């Protein structure tokens, strides 16, 4: 915790309306504490600017009180609290009053204010930092690569249909290729040309035999 501003101010008592000199400390958390003297032994009163203060008046804005003898009205400062209480103050000069107004206004509106002249509280320095929260280290994910790691199914493909010249259809089962651990090898296509014959049945059987032989040889090349 740190002091934002400290100094002497005249404060008017609530009952006898007499002016008394008090030492004021404005903390960075918004607390305004005033003591009997600068030794800070006896606390006269305290106000939390962000919680209790609803208005801050300066100079001619101040109401229901007059400055002490020998002081100008532009030295006056009035703090209005939520419960209706007012704290009537008088600074040493108009410039000092303006400096207090700026510091108090910032303490009332800002969540964390630290002034230029900062003095640190010994209790804040000696306090321990917040406890460290340990987080568990996430376990690394293991991914397997290599042979036999793919468990997906090949897409279903129906049998291949070949038609002879007479219109008769022949079904040949589709053979799934084996890719192995090094990917799919280049396909080998085998084309067998038969001599033209007048017999349509012999031509169809030749085409069917050539297709079956090509697929068998292609599967053999894929394996190697």
Curated annotation (Swiss-Prot):
CDD domains from the entry?
Answer: PH_evt
Q: What are the GO cellular component annotations?
A: membrane; recycling endosome membrane
Question: Its membrane topology, per UniProt?
Answer: Peripheral membrane protein
Where does the PH domain start and stop, copy by copy?
2-109
Q: Which residues bind a 1,2-diacyl-sn-glycero-3-phospho-L-serine?
A: 20
Q: Keyword annotations for this protein?
A: Endosome, Membrane
Q: Which InterPro entries match?
A: PH-like_dom_sf, PH_domain, PLEKHB1/2
Q: Alphabetically, which GO biological process terms does the record hold?
A: regulation of cell differentiation
Which compartments is it annotated to reside in?
Recycling endosome membrane
- Annotated function: Involved in retrograde transport of recycling endosomes.
Domain remarks in the Swiss-Prot or TrEMBL record:
The PH domain specifically binds phosphatidylserine, which is enriched in recycling endosome membranes, it doesn't recognize PIPs.
User: What is the name of the protein in this document?
Assistant: Pleckstrin homology domain-containing family B member 2
Q: Which organism is it from?
A: Gallus gallus
């Amino acid at each position: 915790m740190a002091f934002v501003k400290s100094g002497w101010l005249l404060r008017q008592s609530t009952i006898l309306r007499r002016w008394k000199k008090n030492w004021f400390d404005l903390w960075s958390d918004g607390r305004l504490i005033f003591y009997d003297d600068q030794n800070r032994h006896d606390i006269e009163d305290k106000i939390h600017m962000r919680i209790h203060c609803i208005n801050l008046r300066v100079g001619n804005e101040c109401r229901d009180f007059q400055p002490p003898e020998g002081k100008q009205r532009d030295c006056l400062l009035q703090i209005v609290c939520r419960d209706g209480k007012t704290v009537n103050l008088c600074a040493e000069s108009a410039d000092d009053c303006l400096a207090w107004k700026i510091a108090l206004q910032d303490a009332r509106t800002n969540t964390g204010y630290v002034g230029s002249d900062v003095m640190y509280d010994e209790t804040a320095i000696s306090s321990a930092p917040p406890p460290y929260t340990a987080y568990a280290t996430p376990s690394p994910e293991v991914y397997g690569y290599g042979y036999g790691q793919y468990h997906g199914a090949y897409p279903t493909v129906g049998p291949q249909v070949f038609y002879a010249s007479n219109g008769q259809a022949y079904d040949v089962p589709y053979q799934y290729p084996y890719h192995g651990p090094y990917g799919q090898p280049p396909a080998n296509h085998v084309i067998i040309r038969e001599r033209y014959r007048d017999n349509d049945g012999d031509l169809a059987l030749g085409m069917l035999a050539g297709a079956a032989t090509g697929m068998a040889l292609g599967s053999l090349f894929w394996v190697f």
